[in-house]
Amino acid sequence: MPNALRHQPVPAAGLALWNLGFRPFYLLASIFSAFSVLAWAAQYSGWLPYAYLQGSLWHGHEMLFGYTIAVIAGFLLTAVRNWTGRATPEGAPLMALAVLWVAGRVLVLTPFGAAAAAVNAAFPVALAVAIGFPLMQARNTRNYFFIGLLLVLSALVLASHLALLGAIEVPPQLGLRLALDVVLFIMAVMGGRVIPMFTNNGVPGAGATRHLLVERLALGSVLALFLADLFDVQLAVMTAITLAAAIAHGARLALWRSWRTVGTPLVWILHAAYAWIVIHLALRALAAMGWLGGSYAIHALTVGAIGGLTLGMMTRTARGHTGRPLTADGFEFAMFALVQIAAAVRVFGGMAPSAFLASVQLSGLLWAAAFGLYAVRYWPVLTRSRLDGKPG
């Protein structure tokens, strides 16, 4: 046997689910995302009458502090190891983080509101600690802000629960709205870092570029939006901020040459998802002017941008960190197309009053299908060892 073959690494046998953060959290996020549609239907049908969180409040809470925070956890626990060269939780500590997240999903469907509040506020703090130690040990100051954002998310989810429990006098929805702005900021930061890079690496001659002024305006406008929501500014001010943000993010996307990525699914899904951020901001401006309801803008961000960006990143990082080629076949294309169609149906189909209920139902089914496909396709990828035999 030639030496080159004799010394090739062989994948280790056994369960690899707890080897690195992306593995359990991407799997949990996809399964939860697919089946949460059933839980939403059960709530809507009155089959969970004693659930602490009900209706649209549960729906929004679980989109942010169930699905989205799980993907953020998987991404950060993996990325921080790469950024710092230091260990992040694996094995039993990683399992404990996953159990804490699962407990939060269960408790909001029970009557135990105080316990649900404590657990859901604790998870972002635990995640901040998990990434904070390696970041600080490596003095990776560029990414310290993630620690702060996670602590802000913890404070916001706690505020929502305290409001619901009657401990503070603010609308429970305020914490969710501000948390959505924080998630938008995270997507804007990471999108600006990775989408141009992935575009130029994956599409020869794409020529994706960045402009310092556009970058500052794009990120600054999202911070302004957070402050506008926090202080409940006048509608004219909100209109100006959201229009400026839409223009800034639209210019940013144009610099990335999206039209050149059509033949590369692992790249175009990121561009398509980012386009929904621009749509979200434009629809928020229309809502501030009283021309549309606010839910259209919310779902452009949650279904289109968050759904598309997380699905694209979960696919890309799962393949890259398990030693697989960064390619996509019909399975991945179907997942990406389903979540984008779900967004279009939910946002634009719902604008016709007669089609609103049908658009909600159809988009929910399309969403569940997209993430169900991911769970089925990537179960073996996420639970088995790397193909190249490397750790992780």
Language-model region placement:
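Hydrophobic alpha-helical transmembrane segments of multi-pass integral membrane proteins
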Residues: 1-392
